[in-house]
Amino acid sequence: MHKRRVVVTGIGVISPNGIGKDNVYNAMISGKSAVRLVDGFDVSTFNTRIAAEVRDFDPFVFGLSHDEAVRMDRYVQFAVVAADMAIKDSNL
């Protein structure tokens, strides 16, 4: 079996603790928790009212067009935007 090398050249992050590598890093080193009361949808039928939600994500701010955004699930939007961030971060 051939061992293949992988080189990480760029990072893109969409997470409950922030959007972008610098925001996430700063939240992590400051010990900031992303767990809060859920406000993204009705949780009255669930046993818990807290979660770590991705907040303040606007796909249009990060370059997706309206046509692209409406064709993508929210999580696909996260992946596409994070991949774009990683490509830009790589300076390739």
Language model features with spans:
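Conserved "HGTGT" condensation-loop signature of ketosynthase/thiolase-family condensing enzymes
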Residues: 1-92
